[in-house]
């Protein structure tokens, strides 16, 4: 089967320099959703017709299995499909999809393809409570499709028809090429409409078959930012419903955003306003507090992530405790039972089993062993303005508050570092490391007093 995806439109009502089909739903371009669905049907040829912003669109979705046809001048949907004809296998049927209709299920498209087997012409239709503005499907007394009539051309009786044309079709390719060549642009827009092919197929004696989606929203397209927002909420509600069906506890299904793939184990609980991006895995009994952002991360069983935590490109072991207001950046790896508390940032660092950094700390480019306590205000000084260096802290080290570790530096097992120490040399196992300081007390000192105006 050939699949053609129309993605050449200008999208004027989007009021954006970005091509319409590249606007995101759930963190991915509209067109990427359509391509992903198309691939599940295993087409022999997959062609995307580009036009407005063609180079941007190509760059965004280019892949070995995708061919591109160019519609240099925007002359309608029929003209767009015509540009794809040289890339199609004429012996296979062609399914036509739209790059701004992202939520159509693969099962719906398969139903249409199955209905149109043996050389039939298939149309995806949908029945709407309010069909105003759409082309109506007109059937004869036997139920056969006789034509599609546009709103402006419909009779009063035809306007009562609730079944409308979605524009998604499947048809024999050789005949499609012939019909496209016969299209005329005698309309107000001066364009060649793909919908006009239906009448040509009927005149040629082709049987017109239809299929309908399970849900009305599967055929919704995007022409404005308001419609884009509407589809985003529909998609996110679908994701939330699937999570609930899998046993995930959501404090409010209307306040979760999944912009990628979220895999959850048993008894996972997610509070409100959480955003998941990229590829995220939450193991059994994970609890996520409110207002967290988690991107491309794996979270071990029994972990608790408190409110306002940001995690990006990190791996968390089992029973870790993170936040609130913590930040784990790419390369952060936490072993089982590690703690990273409020206003702690970890980047490209390993924190060992049971180690804790509970307050106001920066850990970057570091290897920290097991059972290490990192006091408040500790900083690994990893950057000299040109190069990054690593800090190594062995097992069972106690780091006092307000410590600076100037990398590259190695701290041995069981070391105690006194509060306020700057460590710039390696420290041997088991010692107390401190900077000698003298505390002086002066009598007779008087603090300045503000003068009253």
From Swiss-Prot:
Organism for this UniProt entry: Burkholderia multivorans (strain ATCC 17616 / 249)
GO BP terms, alphabetized: cell morphogenesis; cell wall organization; lipid A biosynthetic process; peptidoglycan biosynthetic process; regulation of cell shape; UDP-N-acetylglucosamine biosynthetic process
Region feature Pyrophosphorylase, mapped onto this chain: 1-225
Residues annotated for acetyl-CoA binding in this entry: 376, 382-383, 401, 419
EC number assigned by the record: 2.7.7.23, 2.3.1.157
Keyword terms of this UniProt record: Acyltransferase, Cell shape, Cell wall biogenesis/degradation, Cytoplasm, Magnesium, Metal-binding, Multifunctional enzyme, Nucleotidyltransferase, Peptidoglycan synthesis, Repeat, Transferase
Cellular location(s): Cytoplasm
Purpose: Catalyzes the last two sequential reactions in the de novo biosynthetic pathway for UDP-N-acetylglucosamine (UDP-GlcNAc). The C-terminal domain catalyzes the transfer of acetyl group from acetyl coenzyme A to glucosamine-1-phosphate (GlcN-1-P) to produce N-acetylglucosamine-1-phosphate (GlcNAc-1-P), which is converted into UDP-GlcNAc by the transfer of uridine 5-monophosphate (from uridine 5-triphosphate), a reaction catalyzed by the N-terminal domain.
Swiss-Prot/TrEMBL cofactor(s): Mg(2+)
Record keyword Transport present: no
Name of the featured protein: Bifunctional protein GlmU
The keyword Acyltransferase belongs to this UniProt entry's keyword annotation: yes
Region named N-acetyltransferase: 247-453
Pathway assigned to this chain's UniProt record: Nucleotide-sugar biosynthesis; UDP-N-acetyl-alpha-D-glucosamine biosynthesis; N-acetyl-alpha-D-glucosamine 1-phosphate from alpha-D-glucosamine 6-phosphate (route II): step 2/2; Nucleotide-sugar biosynthesis; UDP-N-acetyl-alpha-D-glucosamine biosynthesis; UDP-N-acetyl-alpha-D-glucosamine from N-acetyl-alpha-D-glucosamine 1-phosphate: step 1/1; Bacterial outer membrane biogenesis; LPS lipid A biosynthesis
Subunit structure: Homotrimer.
Ranges for region Linker: 226-246
Coiled coil location: none
GO MF annotations, alphabetized: glucosamine-1-phosphate N-acetyltransferase activity; magnesium ion binding; UDP-N-acetylglucosamine diphosphorylase activity
Similarity comment: family membership: In the N-terminal section; belongs to the N-acetylglucosamine-1-phosphate uridyltransferase family. In the C-terminal section; belongs to the transferase hexapeptide repeat family.
Any single GO CC term annotated in Swiss-Prot or TrEMBL for this entry: membrane
